[in-house]
């Protein structure tokens, strides 16, 4: 696989964590999507499985140790410089207290998805 192809595509993961019919969302404080709500997630690193990547991202962004369940969705996002292949997993449990890193300014549990969201996560509340 050429380096150009690797630069044009990246695989990302995100986690849907629903508790008491509310979904956990984070508010970005850095570009891209500064000021927008999103699911916890990020890019898969070399030699990492998709589930390992999501566990790492949850730990980095929230300080939570999570149990990752099944794939519940996915999508492709085209940006100006690459294509993101995003795999969405259900998070079926978590331990610890939420402590944000420097990528997010706040978190919230939502029964309705805020208008300023990166993506419409509402379908995950209807499960």
Q: Where are the model-predicted features located?
A:
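Conserved Nudix-box catalytic region and its N-terminal flanking loop in Nudix hydrolases
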Residues: 22-60
């Amino acid at each position: 696989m050429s380096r150009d192809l690797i630069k044009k595509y990246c695989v990302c993961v995100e986690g849907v964590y629903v508790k008491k019919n509310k979904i956990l969302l984070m508010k970005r404080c850095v570009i891209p999507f500064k000021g927008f709500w999103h699911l916890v997630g990020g890019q898969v690193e070399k030699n990492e499985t998709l589930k390992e990547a999501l566990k790492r991202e949850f730990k980095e962004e929230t300080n939570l140790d999570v149990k990752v369940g099944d794939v519940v969705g996915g999508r492709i996002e085209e940006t100006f410089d690459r294509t993101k292949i995003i795999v969405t997993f259900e998070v079926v449990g978590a331990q610890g207290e939420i402590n944000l890193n420097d990528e997010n300014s706040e978190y919230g549990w939502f029964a309705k998805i805020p208008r300023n969201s990166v993506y419409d996560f509402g379908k995950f509340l209807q499960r």
